[in-house]
């Protein structure tokens, strides 16, 4: 009988090489699975997060309304900042159902958690748990108001804007590994994302008189500055803290989403409806694709 089997009772160099490679792969798989991945049904029990430690406050206090507006400066936007702060405060209050303190914080947290799980990609992200939310205390500050030169509309106004606040979000989730089988393992991830700074120029375009759906258009510059601070923990038993690539990925995704939605159209009462404006936007996008 010929002795040309791959495996035999007498080990050969080829057999030893194959067994050695397999043992290394098995060892690496065990290290990844038992140190960093979590195969339990409740990953948060084995990878608890100290939310009080992750939640950072930078000590910003609410800005008080100015006692005197700068009436002598024609380019001052302080009057608009007063209005903008009031509008932002109303949105914060609505998100909290008008309730102060811990009760209002819990309502805002639940709403954001429900929305996050509604839009999450369920194929590779487990349930998202929001631990805490800080809605901030400030509002964007506008300054250096000016009329744009050589603009299509003679009344286009441009501002410079800056926004620094305590806005932050702490959450936990798991990245799902579906190979070689569905939900083979989970990689627990805990994040705290905070706004450090946002800067951009903002353009306000008045409605066109001849437009069938007149709207007020607000857009930010595509060259805006966005700085986020992230605190991260990855892993189950052995944890990786503050992975730089994860910070870069989060900042890139937030920038991409903000750039894609950099233009807002405000429907003017009595001149157009939301449905009409949406149809007009779809038509503009179709014309842009054809051209």
Curated annotation (Swiss-Prot):
Residues 73-277 form the SMP-LTD domain. PROSITE patterns: SMP (PS51847). It is a single-pass type I membrane protein. The chain crosses the membrane at residues 17-37. GO terms for cellular component: endoplasmic reticulum membrane; ERMES complex. It is found in: Endoplasmic reticulum membrane. Its main location: endoplasmic reticulum. It comes from the Eukaryota. GO terms for molecular function: lipid binding. It holds the Pfam family MMM1. Belongs to the MMM1 family. The SMP-LTD domain is a barrel-like domain that can bind various types of glycerophospholipids in its interior and mediate their transfer between two adjacent bilayers. HAMAP family: Mmm1 (MF_03103). This is Maintenance of mitochondrial morphology protein 1.
